[in-house]
């Protein structure tokens, strides 16, 4: 799903969940090539063509406008230089989540929980650890032993990052989520400083196991471990915006 459409869908779900019109929802998606920059993205060098200005989100009620560190044809946002060809083949979004820069693309699983956080934990840091546990459990299903790295958010294998997290909680409801590298091309990460961590090297399940991974199997594992970690029963629905009965 194109990132902008997924973002708009998230925000529709957020509004409905905030008003208790729907129950908690967990989206699992893949995106076409997309760079996103969170609220903690550091300034650096990037030349943006007039046609590829980073896109801003529609505002939620009570939000102030975002001021992205980009200016057309100038400097800002990226910590490394993106060529015109790079920009031409990827969308660019300045988003309202925490964290810095990241890349999404085919072969990467992205999970977006839209949930009332207090039902699971009152601690945002505990929530981040729970998302890490979901990814670590899914990796273990494929005999990949992963770890947390002290001082950083996300999931690591042998010092290389395989899972990233960037979230936002508004009035107790979560948005955004995590990404797990499965079969995706890792080269685009070299054009940015992922998650503001200089010198970080990204990896993927297929790179570690040296074989193509069956995506539905990983998606099933992520879903199962999400249910385990958050102690919920998962049910697939065709329209999560359909009001629930309370």
Report each predicted region and the residues it spans:
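Coil-to-beta-strand transition motifs
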Residues: 160-162, 171-173, 184-187, 200
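Beta-strand scaffold of nucleotide-dependent catalytic cores
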Residues: 164-166
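Conserved phosphate/anionic-ligand binding catalytic regions in large, soluble enzymes, centered on
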Residues: 102, 109, 173-186
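N-terminal lobe of the biotin/lipoate ligase/transferase fold
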Residues: 1-61, 66-156, 161-162, 191, ...
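A short beta-strand motif that forms part of the nucleic acid-binding face
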Residues: 41, 169, 196
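Short, structured patches in soluble enzyme cores that scaffold and shape functional sites
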Residues: 113-116, 169, 180-184, 206-209, ...
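C-terminal accessory segment of soluble enzyme catalytic cores
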Residues: 186-246
């Amino acid at each position: 799903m194109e990132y902008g459409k997924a973002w708009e869908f998230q925000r529709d779900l957020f509004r409905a969940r905030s008003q208790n019109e729907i129950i908690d929802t967990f989206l699992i998606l893949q995106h076409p090539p997309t760079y996103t920059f969170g609220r903690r993205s550091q300034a650096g060098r990037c030349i943006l063509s007039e046609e590829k200005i980073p896109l801003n989100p529609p505002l939620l009620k009570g939000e102030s406008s975002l001021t992205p560190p980009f200016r057309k044809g100038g400097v800002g946002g990226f910590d490394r230089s993106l060529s015109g060809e790079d920009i031409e083949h990827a969308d660019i979004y300045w988003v309202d989540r925490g964290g810095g820069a990241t890349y999404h693309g085919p072969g990467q699983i992205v999970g977006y929980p839209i949930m009332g956080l207090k039902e699971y934990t009152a601690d945002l840091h505990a929530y981040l650890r729970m998302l890490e546990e979901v990814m670590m459990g899914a990796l273990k299903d494929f005999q990949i032993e992963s770890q947390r790295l002290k001082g950083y958010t996300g999931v690591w294998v042998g010092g290389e990052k395989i899972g990233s997290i960037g979230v936002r909680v508004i009035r107790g409801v979560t948005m955004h989520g995590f990404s797990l590298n499965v079969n995706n091309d890792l080269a685009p990460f070299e054009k940015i400083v992922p998650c503001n961590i200089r010198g970080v090297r990204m990896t993927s399940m297929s790179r570690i196991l040296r074989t193509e991974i069956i995506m539905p199997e990983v998606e099933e594992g992520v879903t199962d471990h999400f249910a385990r970690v958050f102690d919920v029963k998962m049910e697939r629905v065709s329209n999560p915006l359909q009001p629930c009965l309370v």
